[in-house]
């Protein structure tokens, strides 16, 4: 199993001196393009807007904060968006997709997937020819179902 942690990103640390004895640290975080391996992976994003893509096997992906673009590719994946307005695609495999906080777009892709939006106004796109399940669809939150979603 491969663990790829995007939190090993580069941080620029500046110290702004206001007056003697008072300082404020300022940090800058850059988004990452994170690509998994053919084997099972655990992939972590950063607090920035990341692009995370896996290439197969059964993986766990955590976008963390930011407006992330996440693709599970092949394999039965567990994908978590976390805080931010994420776009998450399961693609192939029987995936469990969690948007968590934010206004997310969740797409199951092929096979039978489980889509859970979390808080926020979420869009669900169930895969063509699949039997996806949406576990928290709520019209009161003005959520939108797209595509072939049938199971709520």
Give the positions of each predicted feature.
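Extended, small-residue-rich solenoid/repeat segments and analogous flexible loops
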Residues: 20-46, 51-53
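Glycine-centered beta-turn/loop sites at beta-strand termini
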Residues: 36, 45, 54-55, 63, ...
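Bacterial N-terminal signal peptides
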Residues: 9-22
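Long alpha-helical scaffolds
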Residues: 31, 56, 65, 135-136, ...
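Leucine-rich solenoid repeat scaffolds
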Residues: 116-152
């Amino acid at each position: 199993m491969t663990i790829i942690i995007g939190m090993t990103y580069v941080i620029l640390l500046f110290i702004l001196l206001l007056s003697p004895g008072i300082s404020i640290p300022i940090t800058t975080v850059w988004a990452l393009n994170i690509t998994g391996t053919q084997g099972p992976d655990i992939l972590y994003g950063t607090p920035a807007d990341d692009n995370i893509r896996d290439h197969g096997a059964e993986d766990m992906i955590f976008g963390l904060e930011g407006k992330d673009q996440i693709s599970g590719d092949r394999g039965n994946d567990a994908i978590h968006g976390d805080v931010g307005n994420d776009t998450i695609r399961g693609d192939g495999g029987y995936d469990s997709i969690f948007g968590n906080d934010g206004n997310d777009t969740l797409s199951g892709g092929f096979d039978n997937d489980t889509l859970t939006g979390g808080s926020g106004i979420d869009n669900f796109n169930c895969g063509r020819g699949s039997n996806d399940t949406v576990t928290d669809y709520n019209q009161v939150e003005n959520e939108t179902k797209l595509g072939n979603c049938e199971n709520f």
